[in-house]
From Swiss-Prot:
This is Multidrug resistance protein MdtC. The lineage of its organism: Bacteria, Pseudomonadati, Pseudomonadota, Gammaproteobacteria, Enterobacterales. It comes from Salmonella newport (strain SL254). The gene is mdtC. One of its GO terms (molecular function) is xenobiotic transmembrane transporter activity. Its main location: membrane. Gene3D superfamilies: Multidrug efflux transporter AcrB pore domain, Multidrug efflux transporter AcrB pore domain like, Multidrug efflux transporter AcrB TolC docking domain, DN and DC subdomains, Multidrug efflux transporter AcrB transmembrane domain.
Amino acid sequence: MRFFALFIYRPVATILIAAAITLCGILGFRLLPVAPLPQVDFPVIMVSASLPGASPETMASSVATPLERSLGRIAGVNEMTSSSSLGSTRIILEFNFDRDINGAARDVQAAINAAQSLLPSGMPSRPTYRKANPSDAPIMILTLTSESWSQGKLYDFASTQLAQTIAQIDGVGDVDVGGSSLPAVRVGLNPQALFNQGVSLDEVREAIDSANVRRPQGAIEDSVHRWQIQTNDELKTAAEYQPLIIHYNNGAAVRLGDVASVTDSVQDVRNAGMTNAKPAILLMIRKLPEANIIQTVDGIRAKLPELRAMIPAAIDLQIAQDRSPTIRASLQEVEETLAISVALVILVVFLFLRSGRATLIPAVAVPVSLIGTFAAMYLCGFSLNNLSLMALTIATGFVVDDAIVVLENIARHLEAGMKPLQAALQGTREVGFTVISMSLSLVAVFLPLLLMGGLPGRLLREFAVTLSVAIGISLVVSLTLTPMMCGWMLKSSKPRTQPRKRGVGRLLVALQQGYGTSLKWVLNHTRLVGVVFLGTVALNIWLYIAIPKTFFPEQDTGVLMGGIQADQSISFQAMRGKLQDFMKIIRDDPAVNNVTGFTGGSRVNSGMMFITLKPRGERKETAQQIIDRLRVKLAKEPGARLFLMAVQDIRVGGRQANASYQYTLLSDSLAALREWEPKIRKALSALPQLADVNSDQQDNGAEMNLIYDRDTMSRLGIDVQAANSLLNNAFGQRQISTIYQPMNQYKVVMEVDPRYSQDISALEKMFVINRDGKAIPLSYFAQWRPANAPLSVNHQGLSAASTIAFNLPTGTSLSQATEAINRTMTQLGVPSTVRGSFSGTAQVFQQTMNSQLILIVAAIATVYIVLGILYESYVHPLTILSTLPSAGVGALLALELFNAPFSLIALIGIMLLIGIVKKNAIMMVDFALEAQRSGGLTPEQAIFQACLLRFRPIMMTTLAALFGALPLVLSGGDGSELRQPLGITIVGGLVMSQLLTLYTTPVVYLFFDRLRLRFSRKNSKPVVEI
């Protein structure tokens, strides 16, 4: 009593404390970063290695395997995958959440160094690593176009100057430049001219390499001067290489230009980038795993004026894609929803109390509690994101509950004629324990969430802490500021002028009288109500099993990604044509704003596209509806497929896949994997629960298999090394020398001129100079025949792997898809040598499914323990928790009604309902117990009186929580797919709970009271008819 009196009788101190909380919250709000979701990115590092001309199998065995063995020893690696394609290997290391990315990077570099001696000597450079997840969608894409600059020159400028500058911006993890390659001097050899001159390809290579040398020459000095020696030992342009003497034939000089075309070109001519319909260089910017996307994008945008100032006038720099506008729009929608919730909650209070002064009290308490929460969020390192703002939106209904309970009880004493300060003190004392019980038991619901591990735990932690802090501040405010304002602002009234007898008050009285009449009937038919209660428990179980489930709601971020997969034997020229055709189809769609894409490099038969949709206000369809519409048009393109998926704010795993979800096949036998993967993929493609089924296993690439006759080679004086060197020189785009320039280093690339390598007959023109100096045609000692070969070789851990990716058709949940896949795998009878498991988001979904029930049970158990401690009873917490089954039924039925799957967001709603609906029972039980102790009433009389006495605050708190959540249900625009499942769950649960618990709670209270008496071997009192 003295504690409450301290604040009631010292209004200045109380007001200043509340002002201090508010000011701290305002400061915290201004300092909080902005993000779409809490920071849940796994630390991911990508290791890259190249060996131009090497086949995928060679890259896998000689490059990937040694690196994997070394990298696999690093502590904290959650998953290691690799993909080896033509001339390149990429290894993705995904670390545990608690692994520091910088420490992991140091370990990765050490592992690369340890494996260096095991790697092929012909690698042009050491393996490198990047602290970025290649499967993440870029946060921004910049494009460079020019009417006068070549693609190679644009690429050089982009990679040498722009990418370096952008990479230095805080938060940027990787700047991937695509669409071309660095400038190079290309030497296109004429096989017939070489044969006529008797010059081998190795001789050409050695001559070029020897003619372009950068070595220190030293200096000459005397007693006065010093001269640095400088020579013309470097060749830098095609014009300087053409007159190079590479051989003498009967005393006549054979120059490079006589046997080859020498041009200023690019390192890899098999690259192409496009933006809309124009050739372009793309700068795809990805953030560091721990970086804030909005801050990073803002940093890039702030740098753009400086970048444009350093760009020549002939180059046009544009932003082709930016993830931040939809994120900002989504957060603005949540903020507006929060404001509407506050207004609706205050309106509910006003309609019940019909007093401006009384309404002003919760109208002050709510903002103080919410704004003060921002200070705690800042101290905890949180951000303003969809989940934390949704937590505050839901908290609106919670924080006003405490104020309502205190205010309503004080108002009841004022209506009875008690003086304001006395009413404030008496009313607060009566409900102080109730308010504390409600708040502590509500916070207890979130304790299991705080202890939950993995990605779901990280994702929900900010939500749980934010809501708990808001409830804690609300508890303090409701026991200090609220009674002080009541005592000094409200006036006592005579019974004949009670406001609740007019308008809404008259309706409330009528409802209360009707409730009293129906409650009398219920208390005289407790068995029927008991059956209804048990029915809700059974219905909960059935609904939870039957409802479709998913991990996270599918978001419409306004950005699509597309993966092109063409015939495995397609040429680069044809692949570039497919890219252009697909881009035209998408560009013509009315909902599309911008399209960029690229192909080439190690992506022999694949490409990537990035599509920016128009803002939600300018299009009628959702991202998924647009994908469904485009899928029909894209399917008509022969020889290739384009798989579209909506970019999500949560992307789990480091695999780059052409669909949102993955199922990975593993085997220690590559032959078994290659045998069963097509069968499994075919079976999964036939499932109606899956769409866009595709695989990263591509074993049907065209290959020309050369078979050496070793006996003939020995007789002719030719070894295998010379033969292999011939093929590498001719067809491997071999980098044979380096040109050093002030800003970068460029390569001299040698190969047979494309004019002479259009078909297989090019092999017939190849020859080797034997030990006797004679030109021996390749056909003399080798035979060749076409065959199939893999375009990529994939590993997970150290096992051969193949990942089948899939999307979900409209109306299908992830749980339905995973069940269909598991059922199909069982029906196929896949041998034990081939193992299947879900990867990425589908894997996390499976783990979350296994822990959902445990989490709900843990929350209920935690609430029971807290309530048991507060009430010093084993029985009363069970009475309070009896309100939960009806809320669960309402929530699950509402989800079914709105055709919304049960997701992580819906799980949050269920957890919130555990905290919300028990408040009704707490108010009933508290007053019933007090009536039994002090009033000498029987349990039947006590619970009946408690139900009638607390009917008004129960209705007020329930309607406040309901109207606080209603804007989430009705919200549209950006991010609504996250908000609506939470609102649907809470509103559905509250409506059903309010209809049932007003009757089931008193019945359960009486049941446990009689059970208590029976176990204590006391005769129960006779039932009193009411």
